[in-house]
C-alpha cells in the first residue's frame, strides 16, 4: 500500500513548495520592473552627476567606479558559477543534510574568494580593509579596551582631533572590537581581517537554510541553499565587515529557530552582539519576532512556549547590552551621535529624492534578480493571509519590512549593497516559491549579476 504525505488546507503536500503553473508571466513582469528600476537608477544617477549633484558614487546606484577588468579570480568564479548552476539544484534536493551544508559552505567560500580575487590579491583582498576609512586604521591606537569603550561616544562626531574614522564612527564599538580581538590573538593586518570577513560571511549559506529547516520547511531550505551560495552580495562579503554582521545576525536567528529552549539564550547573545555591530540591525528585531512567532509549539503550551523563548533571548540581548553599558557605552547615546555624524559628511549632499528609490536598485544587485519575483510570490499569500506559518513567506516579508524602514529613515543613502547584506540574504528564503524547473535559470541570473558587477565596476573603496 502506497502512502502519501499529508496535504495542507491549500491542497498541496506538506513540506513542498506550492505549484507555480501559469505564473511565469508574472515573474517575467517583475523581472522587467527590476530591469527598469536599475536602468532608471543608472541613467538618473549619471544625469545628476553631469549636473553637478553630489551623489558621491561614481557608478550610482552602487558605491563604485566604472573600470572594466579581469583578474586571477575570473576563471575560478566562472567555474564555481557553472558548477553550482549545473549541479546545485539537484544536489540540494538529494544530498544528506550535513553534507549539503558542508558542501554549500565550501562552495560559498570558493565563490566569495574568487570574486574578491578578480580585483587582485592586494587590492581585492589583502589591502581592502587597510584604508583610512576602515576599522583596521584604528586598531593600533586601541591599547586599553576599557578606556576605548568608556570614551567611544566622545570621538564619534567629526572635526575633532581624535575623531574616529568613517566606519568606526558609524558603528557601535563591537565592530572595532572584533578586529582588535583578531589583532590581540596574533591575526592582525589586512589579510587576516579580510579572511575573517569571508570565512564568517559564507556561513549565511548554512544559517539561513538551517533556520528554514528548524521552522519546518526543509524543502524551502534546500531550494534556497544554492541561491545563497551564488549570492551576488558576495562581491561585498569579500571583503567587508558587513559580511561578519550578516553572519552574526543569521546565526542568531538560526539558533532562535531551533526547537526547544536551550538555544534561546545563546541566540539572544548573538543578537545582542549584532545590535552592537551595526545600529541598523535594530531593525532585525522584526526578523527575530517573526522567527519566534513561526516556531513550532506544543499544542498544550501554545504561545506560552514562545513567550519563554522570547524572554530567554531577550535576556541574552540584555546581557550583552548591559556589558557594554557597564564598560561605558550606551547604544542610544551612540545612535544619536551617529545620526549627527552622518549629516556631517556626504549624507548632507546626497539627495534623498534619488537615493530613496535608487537604493532599491542597489539592493537588487546585492540580492540578485531572483529576489524580486520570489518576494512577489511571497507577498501574495502574506496579503491574502493564506500563507499559514510558512517561513519562506514570512521571513522574506519581514526582511523587506526592515529594508523599507531603513530606506525611509534617510540614514542609508547609498552603499546599501553592503549595508543591507544582513537583510538581503533573508529575501532569498522566498526562492522556494519559484518554479523548481526554473531554478537553474534564476541561478544563472544570480551568478551573471555578480560577475558583471565585479568585472565592470571597481567596488574597492
Language-model segment annotations:
Residues 33-37, 101-108, 266-271, 301-330, ...:
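Hydrophobic alpha-helical membrane-interfacial segments at the cytosolic entry of transmembrane helices
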Residues 82-87, 364-393, 400-407, 429-430:
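Hydrophobic, aromatic-rich transmembrane alpha-helices
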Residues 229-233, 251-253, 263-290, 319:
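Membrane-interface alpha helices of multi-pass inner-membrane proteins
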